[in-house]
């Protein structure tokens, strides 16, 4: 071992102060300060305090370093930027742990401690956990040097290494340092924490990495401590001592702030020490400082000569690497250290936890620049090269496409010229057709004018002849020599014929003969747009060909509004509706076994009652009555009025008591007054439905309190078939099927159905809505009627605006026709519309005062009008497959069937069965389905006026607003009781499915069905909604 260039203090004192081994069986203390053996002599302490009075240890917890078996000098030596001027203080040595790495900073640690670690603020590495793990630390202790030079070399190099890592906790025999952070005293240290001032084993490093209590701790991994403990000399010029490779890397911004604060404190302390008055320096201190300055100067020159050209490049690379560090845009404090191959983006730790789970996404670690290995670098370079190759390939494709731009322009130009020529040809054809039509109309006008002139001339000739004959007759009578009495008989004979001729002449003169050209400019505009043609372009860019123009050709936005969900959202909502239906089916499955027998009996009763026209309602009547106590069975038992009614009322009261807490949230006492008061103040929305009275639950309360609804039904039965109460026990009179049918209907409308539907309804949402209040295009003041033609165009009767508006299936305005008036092509309060499917003609009914029917063609041109002297209160209108017009009237409860010319084919009254009809539809079997708002059902008649059956009822179809029949022949009954509800039946009355809207609507006017499985709803909020209903499996009550 080479001798130290500076004499040892022990040799100067004349004796070796050996310290016994640091590692022994009895580990004395957890602190690295504890030593076994003799303490430093008093002379050493005197040396330290001779020059530096009041100086303390370099660190708060000093460490003892054993070098070559000698005890080091207990003094602190700090070298300034110049080798000649230096000051020594414990505070400056302590502050050197946070100063930046520079080759001019060195120092001797006092009281057995080497120079503290120099932490550079520029050397920042990524954090792998709560503890900040630094880069590998290599020992800077030169085994070949000893004494003062060996102490000074580590500090004089200006590197970030610390001799503490190899010598502070190392015994004289070269054993590695032990962990001082845990209770296990036999674990080798692999790192050091500068916050805890402890050496760490592998377990402690793991704890610092993952435990939150160690967040922000600076942990430095120790590399090569085995070599340093065995005494293997490390050359000063070796790459392992390179400051760039031995720096501590930190990624914590808080650590950098603390380091900067420590640097400022260190600089302030140094300035304060420089301002202190110079104290006399002992001879020994002068020798030590001179030796330290000389060694530092030699070491610095050696490093400058070896790494002078390399170090600036490494610093520049480090700065570039720090600039290349990217932070997550969402999590500002996290680095983008991972790459998600699945999503082809860089992510941080938080992004992995939230969105890029390991099981579903393929992740790889993007190594930090300071930690990149050769293998990782090669993989990243290959990935980068692959990406660049792909980009070059895409660029080549773009270049190829751009090269064909001339050909594309030529092709587009040819297509433009072709379209231009075809457009001109179409215009010429239209012009020729207009000229031809103009010639025809002029010829017709000339013919009519000539005929009128000729007729006038002939009449004038005849009138002159008549005048001449009349005057001649008068003169002949006056000149006659016979007495007047003899001529009186002849004059009386000629008087009658003469008066007739004069009257005929006067009437012919007063007959109006008007010639007028009738034209509909809006219809012409719509017809030209529909028939002239259109430009079709598949361009998707935002240029002129890609701009979407509205159908009215003016380029303005159509009056259409859609819900916030897009088309994808509407499809997702349909899937959500299916899921909801599955949940409902699973809910019903739990009750299937319980109701299986009852459902079977219901089907049998239904099949047996089809002959009476009861359908589902009759079956429900039998089923519900049997469950309520046998009200229908009481017909043969004689207890009809007392026992049957009391049991039925009791069942309804019990059901109502169960229903009210669910709907209103309040308790139900069971008394009549409490039930009535609970209904009176409950939910004012219940009064919104069409035809609804204030007594919303009048049927239920009447059943509870013994109202006259059921009694009236029984009284009618008594009037038809005799006294039921008195005659039932004694045999009574037999009730006819017709009277039983009437009684069944009245019972059905009185008490058999609950006030709120007990069937489970599937949710549906509207996918389009349009319209608003106003008088402009696409605006309404009262959209009271709606119909759909074969092209799925929506035809709306705007009553108070006295017009008909036509929209496409997306709700975009097309055209309108009509104006206020009583003349031809004028409308006055149109309230319902229907469409002839074959021809597209539009049938319009008007309410009072005209109460007539007008027919327009599909372009809005007037055809004819009729029915003003026949109709009184037209409410619903429809057209069958043979073009016959069926009109149902409210108030007078009458159905009238017209042909296209206005002739009455059939007419019948149905006041016995209808209460307030408001919608009508027909099937191909000449059956008329009429929705009755106040009877809560649909009544079915044939063309001869015979009542057939009933579909739906209270509790299922409350206050229906319209009825329709779809392409599958199913009957759809719409009502807006609470929500907008759709209930689908077969034509025989069997329930198929039930739906309801997610949003509530106020009063609704009318509904119409589209071919794509949608229903158009006209509401009193001046808007039209298009709902798509879903066909579901049959559901039970």
Swiss-Prot record:
Q: Name one GO cellular component term.
A: cytoplasm
Q: What is its main location?
A: cytoplasm
Q: Please list the tissues where expression of this protein has been recorded.
A: Expressed during embryogenesis, mainly in nervous tissues. Expressed in the embryonic central and peripheral nervous systems including the embryonic brain. In third instar larva it is expressed in the larval central nervous system including the brain and the ventral ganglion, in two glands (the ring gland and the salivary gland, and in parts of the foregut) the gastric caeca and the proventriculus.
The observed outcome of changing residue 875 to A is: Disrupts recruitment by pum
Per UniProt, the ranges with Low complexity bias are 159-175, 565-577
Matching SMART domains:
BBOX
Q: List, alphabetically, the Pfam families matched.
A: NHL, zf-B_box
Write out the residues that bind Zn(2+) 2: 328, 331, 351, 356
Q: Where does Zn(2+) 1 bind?
A: 179, 182, 204, 208
B box-type ZnF: 174-222, 323-366
- UniProt GO molecular function: mRNA 3'-UTR binding; translation regulator activity; translation repressor activity; zinc ion binding
Specify residue ranges for compositional bias: Basic residues: 579-598
The annotated regions of Polar residues compositional bias extend over 31-42, 54-63, 543-554
State the residue spans of region: Disordered. 29-63, 159-178, 543-606
Q: Where in the cell is it found?
A: Cytoplasm; Cytoplasm, Cell cortex
Inactivation phenotype = In larval brain, results in deregulated cell cycle and defective differentiation of immature intermediate neuroblast progenitors ultimately leading to overgrowth and proliferation. RNAi-mediated knockdown in the larval brain results in overproliferation of type II neuroblast cells on the dorsal side of the larval brains but had no effect in the type I neuroblast lineage in the ventral nerve cord. Conditional RNAi-mediated knockdown in type II neuroblast stem cells results in the same phenotype.
Q: Which domain of life is it from?
A: Eukaryota
Repeat (NHL) positions are 767-810, 814-859, 860-901, 902-944, 945-988
GO process annotations (BP): asymmetric cell division; asymmetric neuroblast division resulting in ganglion mother cell formation; brain development; ganglion mother cell fate determination; negative regulation of cell population proliferation; negative regulation of gene expression; negative regulation of neuroblast proliferation; negative regulation of translation
Per UniProt, subunit arrangement is:
Interacts with nanos (nos) and pum. Acts via the formation of a quaternary complex composed of pum, nanos, brat and the 3'-UTR mRNA of hb. Not recruited by nanos and pum to cyclin B 3'-UTR mRNA. Might interact with mira; the interaction seems to be important for brat localization during mitosis. Interacts with Ago1.
Q: Note on file?
A: The neuroblast overproliferation phenotype of brat knockout mutants is used as a well characterized brain tumor model. Early stages of tumorigenesis can be investigated because the tumor initiating cells of the type II neural stem cell lineage are known.
Q: Sum up the protein's function in the record's words.
A: A NHL-domain family protein that functions as a translational repressor to inhibit cell proliferation. Plays a central role in translation repression of hb mRNA by being recruited by nanos (nos) and pum to the Nanos Response Element (NRE), a 16 bp sequence in the hb mRNA 3'-UTR. Probably recruited by other proteins to repress translation of other mRNAs in other tissues. Negatively regulates expression of Myc in a 3'-UTR dependent manner in both neural progenitor and epithelial cells. Regulates expression of mei-P26, possibly at transcriptional level.
Protein's name according to its UniProt entry: Protein brain tumor
**UniProt organism field:** Drosophila melanogaster
> What does the organism's lineage look like at the top?
Eukaryota, Metazoa, Ecdysozoa, Arthropoda, Hexapoda
């Amino acid at each position: 071992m080479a001798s130290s260039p500076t004499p040892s203090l022990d040799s100067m004192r004349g004796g070796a102060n050996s310290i016994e081994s640091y590692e022994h069986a009895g580990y004395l203390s957890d602190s690295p300060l504890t030593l076994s053996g003799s303490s430093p002599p008093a002379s050493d302490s005197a040396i330290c305090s001779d020059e530096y009075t009041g100086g303390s240890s370099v660190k708060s917890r000093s460490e003892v370093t054993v070098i070559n078996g000698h005890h080091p000098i207990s003094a602190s030596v700090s070298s300034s930027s110049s080798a000649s001027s230096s000051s020594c203080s414990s505070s400056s040595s302590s502050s050197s742990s946070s100063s930046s790495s520079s080759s001019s900073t060195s120092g001797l640690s006092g009281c057995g401690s080497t120079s503290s670690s120099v932490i550079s603020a520029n050397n920042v590495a990524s954090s792998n956990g709560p503890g900040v793990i630094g880069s590998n630390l290599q020992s800077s202790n030169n085994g070949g040097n000893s004494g003062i030079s060996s102490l000074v070399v580590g500090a004089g190099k200006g590197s970030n290494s610390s001799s503490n890592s190899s010598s502070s906790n190392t015994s004289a025999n070269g054993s590695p340092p032990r962990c001082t952070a845990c209770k296990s005293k036999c674990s080798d240290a692999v790192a050091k924490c500068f916050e805890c001032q402890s050496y760490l084993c592998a377990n402690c490093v793991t704890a610092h990495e993952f435990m939150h209590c160690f967040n922000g701790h600076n942990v430095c991994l120790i590399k090569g401590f085995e070599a340093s403990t065995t005494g293997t000399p490390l050359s000063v010029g070796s790459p392992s001592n390179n400051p760039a490779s031995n720096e501590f890397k930190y990624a914590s911004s808080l650590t950098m702030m603390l380091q900067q604060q420590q640097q400022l404190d260190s600089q302030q302390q140094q300035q304060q020490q420089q301002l202190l008055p110079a104290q006399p320096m002992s001879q020994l201190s002068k020798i030590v400082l001179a030796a330290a300055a000389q060694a530092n100067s030699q070491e610095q020159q050696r490093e400058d000569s070896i790494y002078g050209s390399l170090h600036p490049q490494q610093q520049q690379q480090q700065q570039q690497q720090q600039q290349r560090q990217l932070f997550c845009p969402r999590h500002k404090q996290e680095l983008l250290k991972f790459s998600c191959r699945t999503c082809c983006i860089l992510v941080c730790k938080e992004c992995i936890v939230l969105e890029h789970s390991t099981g579903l996404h393929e992740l790889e670690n993007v190594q930090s620049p300071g930690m990149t290995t050769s293998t990782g670098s090669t993989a990243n370079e290959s990935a980068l090269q692959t990406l660049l190759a792909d980009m070059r390939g895409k660029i080549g494709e773009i270049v190829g496409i751009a090269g064909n731009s001339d050909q594309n322009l030529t092709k587009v130009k040819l297509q433009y010229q072709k379209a231009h020529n075809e457009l001109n040809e179409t215009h010429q054809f239209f012009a020729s057709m207009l000229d031809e039509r103009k010639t025809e109309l002029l010829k017709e006008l000339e013919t009519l004018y000539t005929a009128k002139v000729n007729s006038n001339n002939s009449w004038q000739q005849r009138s002159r002849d008549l005048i001449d004959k009349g005057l001649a007759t008068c003169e002949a009578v006056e000149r006659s020599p016979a007495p007047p009495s003899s001529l009186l008989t002849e004059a009386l004979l000629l008087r009658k014929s003469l008066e007739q001729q004069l009257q005929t002449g006067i009437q012919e003169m007063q007959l109006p003969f008007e010639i007028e050209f009738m034209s509909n400019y809006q219809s012409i505009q719509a017809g030209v747009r529909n028939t002239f043609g259109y430009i079709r372009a598949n361009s998707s860019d935002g240029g002129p060909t890609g701009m979407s123009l509205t159908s009215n050709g003016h380029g303005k936005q159509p009056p259409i509004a859609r819900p916030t969900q897009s088309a994808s959202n509407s499809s997702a909502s349909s899937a959500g509706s299916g899921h909801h239906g599955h949940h409902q089916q699973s809910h019903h499955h739990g009750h299937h076994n319980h109701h299986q027998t009852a459902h079977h009996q219901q089907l049998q009763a239904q099949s047996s009652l089809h002959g009476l026209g009861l359908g589902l309602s009759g079956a429900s009547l039998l089923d519900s009555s049997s469950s309520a106590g046998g009200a229908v069975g009481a017909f043969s038992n004689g207890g009809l009025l007392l026992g049957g009614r009391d049991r039925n009322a009791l069942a309804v009261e019990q059901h109502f008591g169960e229903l009210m807490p669910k709907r209103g949230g309040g308790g139900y006492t069971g008394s009549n007054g409490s039930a009535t008061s609970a209904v009176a103040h409950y939910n004012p929305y219940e009064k919104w439905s069409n035809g609804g009275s204030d007594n919303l639950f009048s049927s239920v309360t009447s059943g509870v309190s013994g109202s006259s609804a059921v009694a009236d039904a029984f009284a009618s039965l008594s009037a038809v078939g005799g006294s039921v109460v008195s005659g039932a026990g004694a045999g009574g009179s037999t009730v006819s099927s017709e009277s039983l049918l009437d009684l069944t209907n009245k019972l059905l409308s009185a008490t058999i159905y609950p006030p709120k539907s007990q069937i489970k309804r599937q949710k549906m949402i509207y996918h389009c809505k349009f319209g608003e209040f106003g008088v402009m295009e696409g605006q309404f003041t009262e959209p009271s009627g709606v119909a759909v033609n074969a092209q799925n165009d929506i035809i709306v009767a705007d009553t108070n605006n006295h017009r008909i508006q036509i929209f496409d299936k997306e709700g975009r305005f097309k055209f309108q026709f009509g104006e206020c008036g009583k003349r031809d092509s004028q409308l006055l309060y149109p309230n319902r519309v229907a469409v002839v499917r074959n021809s597209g003609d539009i049938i319009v009914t008007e309410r009072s005062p005209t109460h007539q029917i007008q027919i327009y063609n599909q372009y809005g041109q007037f055809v004819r009008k009729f029915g003003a002297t026949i109709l009184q209160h037209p409410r619903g209108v429809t057209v069958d497959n043979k073009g016959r017009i069926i009109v149902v009237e409210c108030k007078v409860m009458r159905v009238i069937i017209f042909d296209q010319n206005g002739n009455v084919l059939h007419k019948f009254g149905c006041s016995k069965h209808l209460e307030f009809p408001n919608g009508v539809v027909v099937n191909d079997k000449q059956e008329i389905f009429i929705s009755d708002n106040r009877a809560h059902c649909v009544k079915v008649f044939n063309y001869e006026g015979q009542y057939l059956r009933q579909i739906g009822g209270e509790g299922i179809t409350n206050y229906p607003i319209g009825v329709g029949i779809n392409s599958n022949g199913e009957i759809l009954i719409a009502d807006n009781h609470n929500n907008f509800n759709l209930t689908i039946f077969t034509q025989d009355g069997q329930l198929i499915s039930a739906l309801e809207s997610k949003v509530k609507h106020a009063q609704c006017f009318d509904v119409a069905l589209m071919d794509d499985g949608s229903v158009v709803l006209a509401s009193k909020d001046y808007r039209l909604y298009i709902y798509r209903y879903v066909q579901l499996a049959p559901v039970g009550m």
